[in-house]
Amino acid sequence: MAKVSLFNSKGENIGPIDLKDEVFAIEPNFDVIWRYVDMQLTNARAGTASTKTRGEVSGGGRKPWIQKHTGRARQGSIRAPHWRHGGVAHGPKPRVYFKRLNKKMKRLALKSALSLRLKEGNLIVVDEIKFKRPKTKDLREVLKNLGLENQKVLVVLPKKVEEYVNVKISGRNIPGVKVIIADNPGVDRTNIDGLNVYDILNHDKLVLLQGTVQKIEEVLG
């Protein structure tokens, strides 16, 4: 089994922890990672961009001047695309952006992203982070103790309880830091709500609590 150091919130190394090879130590499949991120970003698009064609712009129903004998170029409508205030040629219209992946590829993409972070040495496991009340200063102190100050950090918490929600709120005002809760595994048992490939790759460091590791291994192992 893969091993990684386990830290406490003071930044002290309290010993190694075993990680399942089938989740954290596979050979990253970059093709599947790309497909998953492409699906995420595509499905996040609103698809509401809209422009008017020359037939939809108000006005322009008559010919602006006669065809011949004016010395000017012939024109058919003041709402043609090359006119100021004219319609848009080949512009966007509202549409649905949607892509999907099968369960096997979703699981592989997530395990590949986790394995990549471990392979790079950018995965940190912490025994526990809990706050009685939201306080940005406290989370800054924890990240500083872990040597993660002024870095892009993704912190993944195991479940939605008050002490963890307070940690999530505490991270809102720290630039580059995102805190998510990996709660309620999906009904197809192939993913963890909140934990996704794009966020893992979009942050330089991945911080998992010991409870988060257990949940990930339970779902993906």
From Swiss-Prot:
It comes from the Bacteria. InterPro entries: Ribosomal_uL4 (IPR002136), Ribosomal_uL4-like (IPR013005), Ribosomal_uL4_dom_sf (IPR023574). Part of the 50S ribosomal subunit. One of the primary rRNA binding proteins, this protein initially binds near the 5'-end of the 23S rRNA. It is important during the early stages of 50S assembly. It makes multiple contacts with different domains of the 23S rRNA in the assembled 50S subunit and ribosome. Pfam families: Ribosomal_L4. The keyword RNA-binding applies. It comes from Thermosipho africanus (strain TCF52B). This is Large ribosomal subunit protein uL4.
